[in-house]
Curated annotation (Swiss-Prot):
GO terms for cellular component: mitochondrion. GO terms for biological process: DNA replication. Its main location: mitochondrion. The keyword Nucleotidyltransferase applies. Keywords: DNA replication, DNA-binding, DNA-directed DNA polymerase, Mitochondrion, Nucleotidyltransferase, Plasmid, Transferase. It comes from the Eukaryota. InterPro entries: DNA-dir_DNA_pol_B, DNA-dir_DNA_pol_B_CS, DNA-dir_DNA_pol_B_mt/vir, DNA-dir_DNA_pol_B_mt_lin_plsmd, DNA/RNA_pol_sf, DNA_pol_palm_dom_sf, RNaseH-like_sf, RNaseH_sf. PROSITE patterns: DNA_POLYMERASE_B. This is Probable DNA polymerase. SMART domains: POLBc. The keyword Ribonucleoprotein does not apply. It holds the Pfam family DNA_pol_B_2.
Amino acid sequence: MIKFYFTTFHMKFPARLFSTSGNRANFEENSSNEVQNQIKYLKDFKKENPKFNWESTTEPKHMILSNIGEYEKNDFNLKSLLNINEFNINVELLRQLFMKLDKNFTYALGVILRNVDSNTNISVDRHFLVNFNTDPVIILQQIYDRIIFLSEKYYLVPVDKLFIKLRKLNFKVKNPVFHPIAKEKTNIHTTIPKGKSKLSRAEFVPHTMDLKFYGVETKHDKEKNIRIFDNGKVILKVKIIKDGVYHLIDVISRDNRLLYQFEDVKHGDGLKRYWINDNMYYYYYDNTLVNVETPQKVGNIEPAKRDKTQDKKILAFDIETFQVPTGNGDSTMIAYACGFYDGKKSLTYYISDFISQREMLLACIKDMLKYDKHTVYCHNFSKFDINFIIKILVQEFVVEKIISKDLDILSIKISYKFEPKKKGGKAERHTITIADSCRLLPGSLDKLAKDHNIITKKGKFPYKFVNKDNLEYVGLLPDYEYYIDPKKGEMITLFEWAAMYTNKWSMRKETIIYLEKDIKALYQLMMEMSNNTYSTFRINITRVKTASALAFLVYRTIFLPNEVEEENETNSPNNILSLFDKKEEKKLTPKYFLPKLKGRLERAVRAAYFGGRNEIFIPIINNIFSFDFNSLYPTAMMMPMPVGIPVHTFCKNLNEIFGFVRAKIITPAINIPVLPCRVKVNGVQKLIFPIGEWTGWYFSEELKLAVEYGYKIEVLESYVFEKRDDPFKEYIEHFASIKDNTKGSKKQMAKLLLNTLYGRTGMNDSAAEIKMLTTNELDNIQLTNNVIHEFEVDDDKHYVRYDKKPCPVLCAQSEKNYELLSYLDGEKDDGFIINSTSIAAATASWSRILMYKHIINSAYTDTDSIFVEKPLDSAFIGEGCGKFKAEYNGQLIKRAIFISGKLYLLDFGGKLEIKCKGITKNKDNTTHNLDINDFEALYNGESRVLFQERWGRSLELGTVTVKYQKYNLISGYDKREKLYSLGKWVNTSPLCINENFEVISKALVSDVGESWYRKRIHYNK
């Protein structure tokens, strides 16, 4: 049994990490000003007092520490980080804690932040190795530094407690050594080799093809056209292929060893020298090194093979739950029924027939395991159902494999050994894979069933009527109010409800009927997808777990391979395979070299990978129109793409480069800037489009667009790729045509494959992964990798989420070879990576380029949508990729109020359309009774309080909870500077940044004038 030791610091500090891309509406449970003040104080204090002894001689006020035992907790009240003595209290608590540690062992120390009000925890994403004699001052500085770093990178809100969690390892490593926290870097710096670098070889070889500078000629073989020179340092053996145009040179030591080989080729008026050993090209002009090119070692995306037989081993599984109130309007979910369907019969389980929820779920899973090698689909499994069964799966079965993305388990493969039915018989081990169907077919089951014309429709059930006391209820039909969903409105009409009237309505019977409809509808949906995918592409959907992975597999199977003639192939005009069946099955070769990047190259290109544009230019405006770009990302994928083997170069001419460039940027005084940048605004990292001067990585074509609008670009280095116009054109055109010319499931499938391909190309395959590990395996992982989250599921079984890449600090502490581990990790990843960051970054860049000329005169933009005063020219309107469509049936928007990104109101002359991302809409498309008066108040700087239902989930506790949380809705737009006139916000101006990515000046114009303001504010009723 693993023993855990706890001590708790009671404090205010950041807890939850929220993504801030897109500048979502600011929903704050509490003001984060206190947090930012604490962080600023600590950073300023450390900067101003670099030699300050953190451990003050002042006697701490609270030093009492009880004996620490298994699962014992001790609370220590701290107010904030603003008082240095409170840091000393924490140091003393840690010191006394460390003194109680076993001297013969090393411990893994984790940090957990807790918010008491919302009863939520989050781990600081780094564990530390500590011993009996670890300096508590150093470790606490490391903890504070890490939390400060996270607070700068993410949006954080205050917490109440900070837990220190220790876990004993089974061995001892050397005394841990701590280093300053390494900040993430996006600027990858390189320079042209200078001096006596082994790469330049300047001391060995002259930078010319003129042989008179090569030294004393010692031999001339005219027959072989070879000349040998001695320059006093080395012997130069020159094979002249074409005099003065192409030479092949061996560099030989004086003891007759071959040192290097290089080729010299005349290059215009200069020289191109290729060092064969290092695979590097040096360019000289007038005896001066002007450029170095280095082809990169990269793999490529390989074609995938088609399946020979269809995998029809599919089950559909679901769990039914009800809510148990826990006070203050909150509740927790309890599973009371479950079941699965195999295409012929359904097996259902009801909690009244079992002694507990656990036994009911266990019985269902064991019965599913009788279907060996089946894939069990469960809709929204990764977000909901997994929480009820994860501990059962780990404790009762063997977990063979987990596929995860971020915090979610997408699928889990388990096995179980069934005892022989007859004496002397052989035991059988069966496996099943439980997967989330929602990741393959996003959307609600009800809507999907309608869109795909599934025979069995999702049922209607009074969810709110169920409670722990009426599970065997038989009586009158539940009141009509139970058939009204506050989010979706009426499930059935009042007439339909009246027609259902009965005094023998049975909770058990109706639950089972509803459950069976759900699992049958899901089974039919997945089988239809399986049949269509196999008959069309000869691909089994069970090979992949997400829609984007399926789209990429279709591309790699059908569109990427070269066409090779085969015998006895029959074409069918109704089958897409007829277009591509003539492919060699045994050895497929790709039409295009789609590079798989890793290491420094991947980091540089990923630094140039920016998301969509979401900005407010004019906050309040009358009489406008809304337009959406049809299939923006698929259209962008038909633009020229960077493929082939990338070459690192120091070429300064932007027009000669197609690829990714690190450049120094100087912007003009432009109101709608071209280039994006990640910058901390008010302590939070955001994607903005600033003016100013900075250095960063960008796609070359976006830099060329910037030059057209007055930007000054100084190229520092770049990765040049081959330019191809057609890697994805065939794929996009094919599915766009199906989407535009078909209906039903074919249309939905084509739309899915069209829109999800791009996302897979940019996935980060080097991120964290989730595994179930033994204690020894966990100990070994903690020696080399950052453990983000871990908890014990069962004896010697741990749920562990950790970084795939080894951590240099942990490797140094545990005396592991970081370089070797990194190399092995890179080699392992190369075979697994099936993405191409260069394609993703170029696609995102092309999408911004395509939209730029249309947003110049817009009031608001969000990735592929614009709001403009004048309708677009008819040449831009139409069906299909590359055209715009008028939103809201082309209606004139009488008034629009834009408060923040994805927070706005549109008034169509009394009829309102409200966008408020993160807050659920009511059935009438309003948001918690927000109206135009509320938006005008927000526009004027006031706030509005909302109460929102939030679902929380905990794998560790195996629970799903429902809470009503209070949110303070404010006008927190800060991606551009607000401009005022007569005290009213009427316009925005880009932020200005410097080389350190700091906002140094906020507005181009301080006041836009009274006449302009009146023109915009006047409401034309």
